[in-house]
From Swiss-Prot:
InterPro entries: PCD_sf, Pterin_deHydtase. CDD domains: PCD_DCoH. It comes from Mycobacterium leprae (strain TN). This is Putative pterin-4-alpha-carbinolamine dehydratase. GO terms for biological process: tetrahydrobiopterin biosynthetic process.
């Protein structure tokens, strides 16, 4: 799997809702209306990630959930991460 250049990542970010390129990963934090709404979103993303065998790091802080995407075995951001970011946007309704 080929690691994307910073320019390729920045170009992909133009089509992604509120994602940022931070510390060599794609990151997005979402504040949900309730704690359980955030947990529901995490469950939907987790189920989808299992089908794709590509798993985001997920940080839960009360109503704020942060998804972090990086292809660990490639040691960088790949097309799999861009695709998963789009999938997460679709799954959470953004």
């Amino acid at each position: 799997m080929t690691v994307l250049t910073d320019e390729q990542v920045d170009a992909a970010l133009l089509d992604l809702n509120d994602w940022k390129h931070t510390d060599g990963a794609l990151c997005r934090s979402i504040k949900f209306p309730t704690f359980l709404a955030g947990i529901d979103a995490v469950c939907r993303v987790a189920e989808h990630a299992e089908t794709k065998d590509h798993h985001p790091d997920i940080d839960i802080r009360y109503r704020t959930v942060t998804f972090i995407l990086v292809t660990h075995y490639a040691d960088g951001i790949t097309k799999k991460d861009i695709t998963m970011a789009r999938d997460i946007d679709r799954l959470i309704g953004d």
